[in-house]
From Swiss-Prot:
Protein's organism: Homo sapiens (Human)
CDD domains per record: bHLH_TS_LYL1 (cd19705)
Gene that this polypeptide is encoded by: LYL1
Record-given protein name: Protein lyl-1
Keyword Transcription regulation: yes
Ranges annotated as biased composition (Low complexity): 257-267
Length: 280
């Protein structure tokens, strides 16, 4: 064991050494660094197994982003910053859909399987619009219902038959219409209009013929018998002379040997012939 005097001498020296070990040596302050455009360097402090970093003594210099800029102070923006917004703002703007005007939205009548429904700025309300199913939807819907398929085929065939009958009737009517070029092609509308005009012309023609027959001469009635007139004396004398001349011009019949009346008339003629030169 040391004497008490030696212990008294050793005591202050040990306490001084302990204080020197415990007290940190003052480190020289680093010179101020010029401001650079890059981010400030931060001194990394290792973790000692704990989730929060250990507290440093007040004398150790530490650069912190929170203490470097006081709250409430806005950073001055340069011309480049004002002309070109940050990438963060561009990303946020890209996610939101741009607002379109009324005429840029899809038309409500063009809705189909591949085109979505009309936007909120549609012209007509969506409750009044009925979307027509496409051919694919009809095929899928009717594939499991054979009755509807058969009914549709029957309806289509009946419609084709009706259309053929209508076309045939128009063709027959076209043959009855007189046109200047006989082989002139006419539409159904023109055929109907020409048929109406032609029918009106025929009606007027029949009326004119009936009016002409009504205004013509009277039909022939029963014939009247001719009236017999009594001839005068002069007419009688003329007729007698004509009869005598006709009798003279006729030849006399031959006389019979038995003394027929023809033989008795013969001497009379001879006497007349004999007397005739004397009369002259």
């Amino acid at each position: 064991m040391c004497p008490p005097q030696a212990q008294a001498e050793v005591g202050p020296t040990m306490t001084e050494k302990a204080e020197m070990v415990c007290a940190p040596s003052p480190a020289p302050a680093p010179p101020p660094k010029p401001a650079s455009p890059g981010p400030p360097q931060v001194e990394e402090v290792g973790h000692r197994g704990g989730s929060s970093p250990p507290r440093l003594p007040p004398g150790v210099p530490v650069i912190s982003l929170g203490h470097s800029r006081p709250p409430g102070v806005a950073m001055p923006t340069t011309e480049l910053g004002t002309l070109r917004p940050p990438l963060l703002q561009l990303s946020t703007l890209g996610t939101a859909p741009p607002t379109l005007a009324l005429h840029y939205h899809p038309h409500p009548f063009l809705n189909s399987v591949y085109i979505g429904p009309a936007g909120p700025f549609s012209i007509f309300p969506s409750s009044r619009l009925k979307r027509r199913p496409s051919h694919c939807e009809l095929d899928l819907a009717e594939g499991h219902q054979p009755q509807k398929v058969a009914r549709r085929v029957f309806t289509n065939s009946r419609e084709r038959w009706r259309q053929q009958n209508v076309n045939g009737a128009f063709a027959e009517l076209r043959k009855l219409l007189p046109t200047h070029p006989p082989d002139r092609k006419l539409s159904k509308n023109e055929v109907l209009r020409l048929a109406m005009k032609y029918i009106g012309f025929l009606v007027r023609l029949l009326r004119d013929q009936a009016a002409a027959l009504a205004a013509g001469p009277t039909p022939p009635g029963p014939r009247k018998r001719p009236v017999h007139r009594v001839p005068d004396d002069g007419a009688r004398r003329g007729s007698g002379r004509r009869a005598e001349a006709a009798a003279r011009s006729q030849p006399a019949p031959p006389a019979d040997p038995d003394g027929s009346p023809g033989g008795a008339a013969r001497p009379i003629k001879m006497e007349q012939t004999a007397l005739s030169p004397e009369v002259r």
